[in-house]
C-alpha cells in the first residue's frame, strides 16, 4: 500500500473570513501540493487544525478531498481522539468514504493511558475500521507515547500497517528492526529527520514543509532512491533550517502565512492558534531568508 509513497503532506485546512472551511482555497492548495511532488495527504491532522474542526466538518472535508484528488493520491483520514468510542465511530464513518485509503489514529492525549490502555485503544479502532490503520505516536503533544514493544505488538494486528513516528530516528530504527514486518511502514513525522529516517529503513515523511518545499523534498527522495547520498545530503542541509523555522511559532500559522504570500489562502487560523502578527511574520521571513 505504501510502496514508493515517500512524500505525504499533512495538509492545512484553509478558512475564510466567516471562519468556515474555504474549499476553493483548499483546492488551490491541493493542486499546488500535487504539482510539487506530494503523493499522499493526511486529512484533518494536527496541521489541519483537527482539534478545532467539528465532526461534521471533518466528514465534509474528507469527502471533498476524496472526490477532488486523482484516485492514485494516497488519502489518510484522521479519526483519532482521546475517546476510544468516538475514535471508533470516526474510523467507521471515515473508512466508508470512497477513495479513503487509510485511517490515522493518535496516541490518546490528556487522559494519559498506560501501554495496555493504548494497545486496547488502537486495537478497538483497527477492529472497527474498513481501512488499514496508521498509528500516530506523538508524545510531545499527547503526554504519552507508545513504546517500541507496544508498536511491535500492534503491528501484528492485520489491520494496522503503518506508523507516523515523531520521536527519534533511533526509535524509528528500533521499530523497523523489531517489527520484522515488510508490510509495516514507518514514516517520520519530523521533516528534519527525512534523510536519517530513510537511511534506517523508513518509508518516507509525513510533512508540513512540503507545503512550501515540495519540489526540494521530492528531489531529496529521488536522490535517496538512486543512492546519490551527496545530493541527498546537500538537499537535507538546505532544507533542515527552513523546516525548523516553520515551527518557530505555533503550527500551522507559519505555513499559512507563507501560503497567503503565494495568494493561495487567507492568513487565518482557528483559536486558540492565532495567525502570525506583523512582528512574527517579519521574524519568520527573516529566518527563512537567512537559511
Swiss-Prot record:
PROSITE patterns referenced in this protein's UniProt entry, alphabetically: DHDPS_1, DHDPS_2
Cellular component, GO annotation: cytosol
Reactions this protein catalyses: L-aspartate 4-semialdehyde + pyruvate = (2S,4S)-4-hydroxy-2,3,4,5-tetrahydrodipicolinate + H2O + H(+)
Localization of this protein: Cytoplasm
CDD domains linked to this entry: DHDPS
Residue numbers binding pyruvate: 47, 206
Pfam families membership: DHDPS
SMART domains linked to this entry: DHDPS
Residues annotated as the enzyme's active site: 136, 164
Keyword Zinc applies: no
Annotated site location: Part of a proton relay during catalysis: 46, 110
The organism's place on the tree of life at top rank: Bacteria
GO BP: diaminopimelate biosynthetic process; lysine biosynthetic process via diaminopimelate
EC annotation from Swiss-Prot or TrEMBL: 4.3.3.7
Function: Catalyzes the condensation of (S)-aspartate-beta-semialdehyde [(S)-ASA] and pyruvate to 4-hydroxy-tetrahydrodipicolinate (HTPA).
Name listed for the protein in its UniProt record: 4-hydroxy-tetrahydrodipicolinate synthase
Organism of origin: Leuconostoc citreum (strain KM20)
Gene that produces this protein: dapA
